[in-house]
Amino acid sequence: MSMSSIPSSSQSGKLYGWVERIGNKLPHPFLLFIYLIIVLMVTTAILSAFGVSAKNPTDGTPVVVKNLLSVEGLHWFLPNVIKNFSGFAPLRAILALVLGAGLAERVGLLPALMVKMASHVNARYASYMVLFIAFFSHISSDAALVIMPPMGALIFLAVGRHPVAGLLAAIAGVGCGFTANLLIVTTDVLLSGISTEAAAAFNPQMHVSVIDNWYFMASSVVVLTIVGGLITDKIIEPRLGQWQGNSDEKLQTLTESQRFGLRIAGVVSLLFIAAIALMVIPENGILRDPINHTVMPSPFIKGIVPLIILFFFVVSLAYGIATRTIRRQADLPHLMIEPMKEMAGFIVMVFPLAQFVAMFNWSNMGKFIAVGLTDILESSGLSGIPAFVGLALLSSFLCMFIASGSAIWSILAPIFVPMFMLLGFHPAFAQILFRIADSSVLPLAPVSPFVPLFLGFLQRYKPDAKLGTYYSLVLPYPLIFLVVWLLMLLAWYLVGLPIGPGIYPRLS
């Protein structure tokens, strides 16, 4: 069945069809990044030959593009090829997480858990459930981007709905809403530190706390859950039509063995969480900062991903033994090998992606583009609401081409934070604008390592899906999320509500 079932007379149907056709003409991601590397090399050579540079408005230093085709570029590239690949942070994190999450899936824990959760939810509200769980999963940082999409598909299968709709709803929650959190997470810590440093250029006493965006971001979870659910139910799933997959994939009932396994896994989960809590909650807890005894930052926050992997391993092992999925010691490595095999295509794709990102950074093209575009926005004299929209759109554009959100904010914050402070706005308010833009376009960013991962998840249920298919399906979420989120922030600003404890959009 075609993914695009809206009649051709529908303008939205024509748009999705156009996106799918254009996207499907794109080469395989591996080749796409090879071509991008060639374009990048030629571009740096031309800009370098003509001595083109940009002036950093914060300190007046020139931002010069370095020539990748020069002798200097060759001397940098050859010794760093392997380092660029093996040191690519998302690759390390994703492969490690797949060991844990893949084991949980292979022993049957995740499917059984999703069936258990879905059994208490009416199929009508499955979209909202998936989105809410996805938002809550942000506590696991990038791990959520790996774990939640397959979970979303399984939940929809369990309630008899189209798994691709559940997959896309989960991608929207963990991707488009990546920085919307009920709890304080690592993103708050990272971005607030960058904002504080940027604000110091204007006011050395200004400090952006990790909780300065909390009220707005927690409220965003509620709004975006409703919006995302409506998009899934009213736009996405009608386009997919009736699920024609194997009926055996509809996980509708649990065996007594699975129920027993879930009970054992639940007990082990509680014991694991209690053990971690004993190392974090007490003031002298061993996972707190050894000097300041704080939770943020602390070894606990820095080690959240390894702890998640260990959690999956321990709980999956308990479930597997209880259900006799794991009968011998040799079963354990075999169960962990299978999900790693599925990552082969992702690993191959990451090689040119990692080289492209490293070359983009070394050549200063990222800084050059960011400074040039921000100069245009600054020189146009935009202020107030136009400045809000300008920063959001600029950030969205840059996030499409630079994989690291923190890297982009490191470039933009020294320019826009002082600029917004001069206009009378709190730096935490500028930070929210960036977070909205960064999150909204994450599932679309061609340089994101998660896009091919999401495509791989989609191909489980639609083997002939290509990049264009993926883009045409996921497109409504980024577009609508960005507009709704900005309107929500505008309303927040006009009403004068606090964006965090004691923090308002405008400086007092």
Regions found by a protein language model. Give the residues of each.
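Interfacial/capping segments of alpha-helical transmembrane domains
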Residues: 46-74, 187-190, 284-292, 363-372, ...
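C-terminal transmembrane helix pair
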Residues: 121, 366, 380-507
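Hydrophobic alpha-helical transmembrane segments of multi-pass integral membrane proteins
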Residues: 94-95, 122-153, 158, 347-356, ...
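Membrane-interfacial loop-to-helix junctions in multi-pass transporters
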Residues: 72-73, 85-91, 118-129, 163-165, ...
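Interfacial loop/helix-cap signal at membrane boundaries in integral membrane proteins
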Residues: 10, 14-15, 53-88, 201-209, ...
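Hydrophobic core segments of alpha-helical transmembrane domains in multi-pass membrane transport
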Residues: 33-48, 97-102, 133-137, 173-177, ...
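Membrane-core helix-loop-helix motifs of multi-pass transport proteins
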Residues: 20, 149, 153-243, 250-258, ...
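Core transmembrane alpha-helical segments of multi-pass membrane transporters/permeases
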Residues: 26-34, 38, 62-111, 297-366
